[in-house]
Amino acid sequence: MNEPKNPKRELGMRIHRRDLIHGAGLLGFGLSLPRSQKAAAEPIEASYPPTRTQLRGSHPGSFEAAHAYTRDQLPPPKPRRLPEIFDLVVVGAGISGLAAAYYYQRQFGPDKKILILDNHDDFGGHAKRNEFHQGGRMHLGIGGTHNLEYWQFNPVVTDLMNDLGVDIKTLRAQSTFDYGRTGKSPYALWFDAETFGRDQLITGCSLKGPPSTSPLLFLDQFPISDTAKAQLKRFYTLQQDLLADLAPEARTHYLRTTGYFDFLRDLGGLGAEARQLFSKSCHGSWGLEAHCLSVAEALGDGLPGLNLIGETPSESGWDYPAAFFPDGNASIARLLVSRLIPAVAKDVTATSIATQAFDYGALDQAAQSVRIRLSSTVVRVNQSGGLVGVRYLKGGQAFEVKARHTVMACYHSILPYICPDLPAEQKAAQAYQVKYPLVLTNVLIRSKKPFDQLGIHGVSCPGRMHASLFLMNGINTGGYEHALNDPGAAVVAFWGSLSPPASALDLRAQLRASREQMLALPFEAYESEVRLVLGGLLGDAGFNVDRDILAITVNRWPHGYAHEYLDLWDEDFAPGQAPHELARARFGNLTFANSDAGASAYTHTAIEEAFRAVNELRDLRS
């Protein structure tokens, strides 16, 4: 299918009008909930953050003040000083910040006054909940943090999950979701006309997967040059240890210090066109281009090439053991909030949390021990007289609150700007930890029948903005059920990052370029991309982009995955001297949580770091 002459008109750019009826769909929300939830659902349709569509994640209004008073170094405005002194102020209402408040209550007592500040209009940080109510039935999307890697839980995290009532075994048993690998053809590739000259869906193969999904037998269908096809055929056919002459230490050194694309070129014989097919393969798992990874990292992530170093790829081990809620780990954030502020919802359990409506008006009430103040951007933190002063902007005004203790549960890279009194070495370590960009675009479609007709539930898109897309059906819990065989409306998740320009050579330049591009793109650009892909992929199966796309929510995370150390770009730091270890050192009554403090982009890491940060405050004996 050729690209339409007037793509904007033919792609049916009408999402703005569709979004206007989103609130009308919410009127039916109470009808689909248990009676105890109706009262909480009815008064909040217009301002309920999880239902907001278009640009979410780092949404408009969540980052401009931070950029102005940190990156652009405008002087912080003179604040209005609020009289109340809190026992604890937490900066950041993500899972780590919420867990810090939870642990603080356990360490110091439930009566302690806690204020949690966050620059977003919703809590949860990257654990973002997307709700869709078009048509009256609620559909959930994962706006950021996906799942629980339960096999990595330490006793601290396990105890928290048990206290919240999270039953991993039950979650696993209720879920049949597998990132789109549940269709008749578990693996599929879609080549688009704009990049490759024609739209081409190829089922049964993958660029990253077990040996049975090798594209070798499908290469003649690829819309690429004959030269690239011949190179790929040789690459996939060759079975030889090309590093046989290297001693074990030299072999390890090569695998860790050689870029994957250099390996593909020098040992695999792949030219630029063939190599480019793999460029986006790690967007979802790493938030990076594949050429940023070493050979060892890329092969460990499932990219091809083991056959060139004398190893045989395994057919097993491709199942990723994880536990899911329908809104991802937003359910963990919501369980924590309901524990900290019971007034947000009644009778909350881990079983019912997916369908529970929250009263956001209850988050910041003076009578409560814990308060969550959203849309509040912290711009300065100082210590004086045994107290921490926290200055923030909300509604165009500056305020300052005082606290005995403060936990910074926000991105490390912003800390040097808002905590100017920190030691220079600590600020340098914090600035080092630049996050990896990520984008998750959730699209509600009228019916999943076109996917079923094509025999797919997911597909990789090597030429498009989002590296992959997949249906979100199959995660069921607590009254929320959207089975794999449900032919009705469904959420399609588009997952990936934004490729930097070729001119960005080093890693930091690439991350900066991707980050700036992500924030600069208007919603219409993401919308046009989604419609082009769904129209090209599903058009022959009867999908009409104007009729069948009901809503689009773009979760853009320019500061996404925590900075995990890379073979090609980070040195082997001495114990205790890694940037994240220096960055998280307690400074007076100030401690540091967030997954950055563990240099690991996982929910359990965020919880572990919250526990450590609060224990450091306990050790002050104040």
Region roles according to the model:
Residues 89-99, 118-120, 378, 405-412, ...:
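Conserved beta-strand->loop/alpha-helix structural units within folded catalytic cores of enzymes
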Residues 16-31:
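N-terminal export leaders
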Residues 1-15:
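N-terminal secretory signal peptides
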Residues 56, 64, 74-251:
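N-terminal glycine-rich phosphate/pyrophosphate-binding loop and immediately adjacent elements
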Residues 370, 374-503:
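Mid-domain catalytic core of redox enzymes
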Residues 42-77, 131, 444, 450-622:
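Conserved flavin/dinucleotide-binding core of flavoenzymes
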Residues 142-151, 246-253, 318-327, 427-432, ...:
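Active-site rim elements
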Residues 233-376, 573:
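Active-site/ligand-binding neighborhood in enzyme catalytic cores
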